[in-house]
């Protein structure tokens, strides 16, 4: 019996010596997010997993937890800082409550007209500066992923600011977004993303804001009668990682993961617009939600009500940051 055990141990040692990788446990990256698999972010997370595992030849294992199955959006940031999860892709609105208020520049209504303008910021000096500010929070920023431009939804027709008066509108935790709703005469309601469907269904809130992909994949078209194509803001994600975990990775692994993330980012941003266009068409075909296209006059009224939110938040976000975004995009008040 002892001799058989000795032979087995020696054989195992021989395999380990012949192939050191076989003796090593893979590095596990838990990647948590709050949206469905069939959204731009959901698909990009799965693509990153595929690339990371293939390119590291199994030395890294990426476990993706979609749809708030591991943490809700109000919990995940603390979990990342504590090291309970290694990677997230939260909306950039989440960094304001963390104390990095400069990120709330992305929440300013009508600051971007299109993805090209957005990318001039995320790919430029402002995007890099914002990621540097996360380092003191035990967070390393890896990439910006697009979702899409937001539209307002409700259970009554919404075309101009007066239509929002007294309406309870769900928002992410962001002072800027709260000011946005107040500027329209509505009542902002901060709520976890995973709770929104039920809140809309039961009338706890009257409406919300989302890109079409989130609106459709979370089945909000089942509980919202109207969707106004306001394109009043963006939801942009930042892929972030626990700084201590990232810094301790072997240099070759880190380099490989950076390459995988770069390719996953291109994939995410390439599909974002199409995914939202497809989702909007699916909402249209489902026939449960009336889609409202604003006239030029209605759009002008919305902008007139919302653009002052920029000035209101200069001291909070930083006038210099807002000015740099204006300069990069050519924004004119």
Predicted region positions:
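N-terminal secretory/targeting leader peptides
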Residues: 24-117, 125-333
